[in-house]
Amino acid sequence: MRCTSFSSFSLSLEDALHLLQRFLYSSNQIKQIHTVLLTSNALVASRWKTKCVYNTLIRSYLTTGEYKTSLALFTHMLASHVQPNNLTFPSLIKAACSSFSVSYGVALHGQALKRGFLWDPFVQTSFVRFYGEVGDLESSRKMFDDILNPCVVACNSLLDACGRNGEMDYAFEYFQRMPVTDVVSWTTVINGFSKKGLHAKALMVFGEMIQNERAVITPNEATFVSVLSSCANFDQGGIRLGKQIHGYVMSKEIILTTTLGTALLDMYGKAGDLEMALTIFDQIRDKKVCAWNAIISALASNGRPKQALEMFEMMKSSYVHPNGITLLAILTACARSKLVDLGIQLFSSICSEYKIIPTSEHYGCVVDLIGRAGLLVDAANFIQSLPFEPDASVLGALLGACKIHENTELGNTVGKQLIGLQPQHCGQYVALSTFNALDSNWSEAEKMRKAMIEAGIRKIPAYSVLT
């Protein structure tokens, strides 16, 4: 007999614990159990048992994504004079982090210190991760330093904190000194390098991982996703490695989840292999918005903008809601097809219907849409109508359009604005020099190159560490 409603029952604490564990991932059932516990006064029966129920309720709401309810339960727990234990705090810390409630996380730190749980390794490790995720690397490292004999989980939390905050030199140095590593350790370092754009290093670490002599480390899905991201954004050697990973996934009959499938799709899309990208897309069983975004972007960026727009219509027919990344892909597709009116119409309707707040990157895409069609004056007027000062992404789009249509006068004006915003960006100086050369203004072209040298800027040559 399947139980679907508990509203007509009273529950003992033992029954409540059993049912909460049984329905851990069912939000409606958890709420019903919680309601019965409140209305039957069961939560005042036994302090020890009540503590277990509170902990389980907090963890249950956390599991179903109701972070604020988890945090509110802690307040109710204290008001009911039920003392938390070391198992209470890790779930609460995760809830504070997931709900971006930095102030609540700091308050939990104070509560843990006050109640003597700050020396529990499980609690300490949770705070290492919390401070790392909210951008306070100093507090994260201080908390880690207080852990006596940190286990591999604590070490991985420190690696993650460093990676999230761009401190990959320290992370890699510490990683190399770790006495014990696991797949999470290796994946965290690979992901950290990949997120920072250090793709050569990410691929190097992956190579060391699969050839590791200290222990056999088998890559997992998260490892492949991180490595594939670097493969997609590196050179042809990276693409070859990505194809080898794809072959490994197929040979091991690994299920193509949305995350793994999207990573493969994105790699093939950036490599220009649209047929394989479409094949991967068809193989993904549960097509979430990220998969749709990847295939639309791949088509839009590789000469099939109309097919990208058709894919967008299929996405809506599948009841998948577009997001900000979808909008960028759609605007790119319209720009490549020079469908200015359709692009502006979709920009307005998507933002309105799906409550998407456009960023400067979106506005930059609109400028690119208008400018690519040769409507440079309209693009400049659009920029002037924006409710904020245009940044480099917006002005850069107009500069790109000026290059396409060789409008040296407007290009020079926009280029000088960009140098004011990004005085250390070599591309702006090179662009201005090129515009002046096109206009046969050789003295100005030379002046721009000298200005770049005087600013201590040089073009970075491309390189590859893969053969």
Curated annotation (Swiss-Prot):
A biological process from GO: RNA modification
Keyword entries, A-Z: Repeat
Chain segments carrying region Type E motif: 394-467
Stretches that traverse the bilayer: none
A GO MF term: RNA binding
Domain of life: Eukaryota
InterPro entries reported in the protein's UniProt record: E_motif (IPR046848), Pentatricopeptide_rpt (IPR002885), PPR_At4g14850-like_plant (IPR046960), TPR-like_helical_dom_sf (IPR011990)
Keyword Repeat: yes
Transmembrane helix listed as a keyword: no
Annotated PPR repeat ranges: 50-84, 85-119, 120-150, 151-181, 182-216, 220-256, 257-287, 288-322, 323-358, 359-389
NCBIfam families assigned: PPR
PANTHER family reported for this sequence: PENTATRICOPEPTIDE REPEAT-CONTAINING PROTEIN (PTHR47926:SF348)
Family stated for the protein in its record: Belongs to the PPR family. PCMP-E subfamily.
Protein name per the record: Putative pentatricopeptide repeat-containing protein At1g10330
Species: Arabidopsis thaliana
Gene expressing this chain: PCMP-E71
